[in-house]
Amino acid sequence: TNTGSSSTLDVTVTPVNDAPVAVVVAANGAEDPAQGIAVKLSATDGDGLANVKSFTVGTPTNGTFYTDAAMTKPVTGSIDAVNGEATIYFKPNENFNGTANFTYTATDSGNADGSNPLTSAPANGTVTVTAVNDAPEAIATTATGTEDPSVGIAVKLSATDMAGLAHVKSYTVGETANG
């Protein structure tokens, strides 16, 4: 039998900072864009999305990241997060198509007093760039011959095309000087 008295015990749990978790991201767009391909970085944090302070992005394969869609400000250092997200813009290398890979991390603002900020493990990101039909490029040529020939002077026309020579379907010849 219990003959003792009851009592109340107060337990105080002091919260500790939990590291954010950077989320795997994927984006896509066409090669040689006029505006950058938007890539949304994202992270979760057990302490709340507002606690995610910034992202740090690694160098992507086959292109460059910018902080603006006009692609005038390359990403350097960290990028501020708003509610666990930030958008950067990818410019693929000229005529690149395929998958560009990168990694990034998220950093939080730490404990309530700002101490002990934590960084997530790296998350993977991909940007899939689709090919577009590039215009062929004419190759300058010259031809020489004698004045007043009985038959015309042969001129070889040639061009290059990123998709292969089979894609060059026709040539248009304008007026010639002196002839």
Model regions: which residues?
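C-terminal edge beta-strand
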Residues: N2-T14, A112-V132
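Low-complexity "stalk/linker" and mucin-like segments enriched in Ser/Thr/Pro/Ala/Gly
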Residues: T61-G84, A177-G179
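Surface-exposed, short loops/turns at beta-strand junctions within beta-sandwich domains
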Residues: V82, E94-G98
